[in-house]
Design a protein with these regions (language model features):
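Rossmann-like adenosine-cofactor binding region
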Residues: 8-9, 53-55, 177-269, 285
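Oxidoreductase and adenylate-handling cofactor-binding alpha/beta cores
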Residues: 98-117, 163-170, 296-309, 345-349, ...
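Glycine-rich Rossmann-fold phosphate-binding loop(s) that bind the pyrophosphate
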Residues: 154-155
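A conserved regulatory-domain signal marking ACT and ACT-like small-molecule sensing domains
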Residues: 315-397
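Rossmann-like dinucleotide-binding domain for NAD(H)/NADP(H)
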Residues: 231-324, 333-335, 368, 372, ...
Length: 397
């Protein structure tokens, strides 16, 4: 059953942080905000990697902002049903991840890791400088210039990776049937666009995956897709662990079909595999990235709490609105079903309310309506709106 809530406009908002959030981001909050240790009384939550799926979400909670791109740790459907808007910060960590992907390409092309480990193992050996000249050939590799790189997924990170690899002299192929206009404009014109991932599999020496984890993409790198690839291909995964089937990649590494698998998500299986370069989830772990993510997350929360503006939500439609100049603003999170606007306006007109401006946006099963009106919102008005079937949360600003 849907959980509904009536929320009056606040002048003081309570923020709960579930992980360490950059101070630079937290300083964006002004004197109208204070931090709380109690999740039950929070108006908004800032989170990075903490698992929220088993947490009890309080009736006060209006928003959750993930300081990062992935939201697998947040119960999106539950939040939508409770009228809690979930935000992410796409692109804020894109440069950090891009740089690590390029590093991963170089680590896979040349046995830098093996060479470093050899030095550590022999650092106390007498005459190591002469031994280096004798052994360095064991760690020889290849240059990436002139090699073919396939980028699957041309979002904020994928575009940066493709452009950077092109500048390094690689022949870059990109595939993304859902590329946005913004990202298409940002993509180098020298990147070769292909329509199917199969073309990438058959063509490229290096393949890097930058897609979200969902049913359609889970284990997309598997025995069948690997079978289409070149012998000695290098696969890079800086998106989500489950995009790659561990058992299939292990067999491909053992047979030599896959030369190296570079992953930012080591687990019990991949950490022990030969041929795997496992990085301990460092993709977004830079000071700059953490600052950028925190600032973006805080701004998203502030805009929603103070104006009702939604940007970069993952469970409700984006609906960017300016600060209202009317007497009041009513925001309604509701199911995306017929006649809802008619029902809202009927209630408002019964209280002799004049609607100065109306915005309605929808996304899948959910919708968001914003009414700027010429009178103060009363408890009775909120209650009447809340009683409409399909309404999830009513708020006045």
């Amino acid at each position: 059953m849907s959980i509904r809530k009536l929320v009056r406009g606040n002048t003081m908002y309570r923020i709960k942080t579930l992980n360490k959030i950059s101070d630079i981001g937290l300083k964006v909050f002004n004197e109208n905000y204070r931090f709380t240790e109690e999740l039950s009384e929070a108006d908004a939550v800032l989170v990075r990697s903490a698992d929220m799926k088993s947490l009890e979400l309080g009736d006060n909670l209006l928003a959750i902002a993930r300081a990062g791109a992935g939201v697998n740790n947040i119960p999106l459907d539950k939040c939508a049903e409770q009228g809690i808007v979930v935000f992410s910060t796409p692109g804020a960590n894109a440069n950090a991840v891009k740089e690590l992907v390029i590093a991963g390409l170089l680590l896979a092309a040349r046995d830098i890791v093996g060479g470093i480990n050899w030095v550590q193992d022999n650092k106390e050996t007498e005459g190591i400088s002469k031994l280096v000249e004798k052994e360095k050939g064991s760690f020889a590799g290849n240059e990436i210039e002139g090699k073919k790189l396939g980028v699957i997924g041309l979002g904020a990170i994928g575009v940066l990776v493709a452009n950077a690899a092109k500048r390094l002299g690689m022949e870059v192929y990109g595939c993304d049937p859902y590329i946005s206009v913004e990202h298409a404009w940002s993509l180098s014109r020298d990147v070769i666009h292909v329509k199917t991932v199969e073309e990438i599999y058959r063509t490229c020496d290096y393949i890097t995956v930058h897609v979200p984890l969902m049913d359609a993409t889970k284990h997309m790198i598997n025995a069948d897709s690997i079978g289409l690839m070149k012998d000695g291909v290098v696969i890079l995964n800086f998106s989500r662990d489950a995009l790659v089937n561990d058992e299939d990649i292990e067999k491909a590494l053992a047979s030599g079909k896959v030369k190296k698998y570079v992953t930012d998500f080591p687990n019990e299986k991949t950490a022990e595999m030969n041929g795997v370069i496992a990085i301990p989830h460092l993709g977004a772990s830079t000071e700059e990235s953490e600052d950028n993510c925190a600032v973006m997350a805080v701004k998203e929360v502030v805009d929603y709490l103070e104006k009702g503006s939604i940007k970069n939500s993952v469970n409700y439609p984006n609906c960017e609105v300016a600060k209202h100049t009317s007497v009041s603003r009513i925001t309604i999170l509701h199911k995306n079903i017929p006649s809802m606007i008619t029902k809202f306006t009927t209630v408002l007109s019964s209280y002799n309310v004049n609607i100065e401006e109306l915005v309605n946006k929808s996304r899948g099963d959910y919708a968001y309506s914003v009414f700027d009106i010429d009178t103060t919102v009363t408890d009775e008005m909120r209650k009447a709106l809340n009683e409409i079937e399909g309404v999830l949360k009513v708020r006045s600003i």
